[in-house]
């Protein structure tokens, strides 16, 4: 259950960050910000780097890291805690589950998606910008 102190539509900084990430991923636009935060206006270490994804991990209001199956197949037990924002509409975010390939090492996209109410998220951690095939 979400903390009641942050369960209204005006108290959702995680949702706001997800909106910014979604816009950046959709437009992959250059910017002038020098802050190394989730809302940095370009991907990678410089504006000329060709990345298309800012992977994130999310934490629920009880402090648990969110994990989802990497496949939609019944009985799938392999889970991931790394996601790509695909779409966001007010307080609902559609996220793609990313799988980590330790041999490469890189993230790969999956066909596993889920929609979450961002009101029930209390923390976000942005991982290093990357290029993900098959988006």
What spans do the regions from the language model cover?
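Short glycine-rich, low-complexity segments
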Residues: 1-86, 94-135
């Amino acid at each position: 259950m979400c903390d009641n102190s942050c369960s209204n539509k005006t108290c959702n900084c995680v949702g706001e960050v997800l909106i910014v990430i979604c816009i950046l991923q959709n437009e992959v636009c250059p910017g002038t910000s020098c802050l190394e935060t989730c809302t940095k206006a370009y991907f990678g270490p410089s504006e000329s780097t060709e990345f298309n994804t800012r992977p994130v991990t999310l934490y629920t209001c009880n402090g648990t890291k969110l994990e989802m199956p990497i496949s939609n197949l019944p009985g799938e037990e392999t889970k991931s805690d790394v996601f790509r924002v695909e779409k966001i509409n007010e307080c609902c975010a559609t996220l793609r589950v990313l799988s980590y390939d330790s041999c490469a090492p890189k993230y790969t996209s999956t066909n596993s998606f889920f929609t979450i109410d961002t009101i029930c998220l209390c923390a976000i951690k942005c991982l290093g910008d990357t290029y993900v095939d098959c988006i």
